[in-house]
Amino acid sequence: QEKLIAWMKSFLTPDGVIFFGFPPWQMPFGGHQQVMTSKLLSKLPYFHLLPMPVYKSVLKLFKQDVAAFAEIKETGISIERFEKIVHNTGYKVVNKTHYFLNPIYTYKFGWKPLHQLGIISAIPHVRNYFTTCVYYLITRRNTG
């Protein structure tokens, strides 16, 4: 993740920006379990947070694609990790929006987007569990 974000700077004009939108890993369906073939697992929030050996056992028991969902688990990202990568790779945040209800849910479920409460967005680590989507606009950090 850090290597990719750092590499993207080579395509960025001096006044350019990069948009990122992602679900924090710890959100209820951060493991993309909604696409699982098991009706139970596809509706079970947070179970992707189980320790990897337990998670793989559950996937195997329910005849899911263990390798695919384990890879998703291994590449999940939190808000804090993303912000640390942004800082460490020489970018700065221009704008950020945290959502309690992801804008894509308009198309999936007919739900209107709902911004996350400021108090929740301000609490590191806790916000990951209750924020379904974040949007970030980043640019080069001035070094001089």
Indicate where each model-derived feature is located.
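Conserved class I S-adenosyl-L-methionine
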Residues: V17-L50
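A structural motif
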Residues: K43-Q64
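A short glycine-rich, Lys/Arg-flanked "PGG" loop and its adjoining helix->strand segment in the class I
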Residues: E2-V17
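A C-terminal cap/extension of S-adenosyl-L-methionine-dependent methyltransferases
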Residues: L61-G144
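Short amphipathic alpha-helical segments
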Residues: E2-K3, G31-Q34, N88
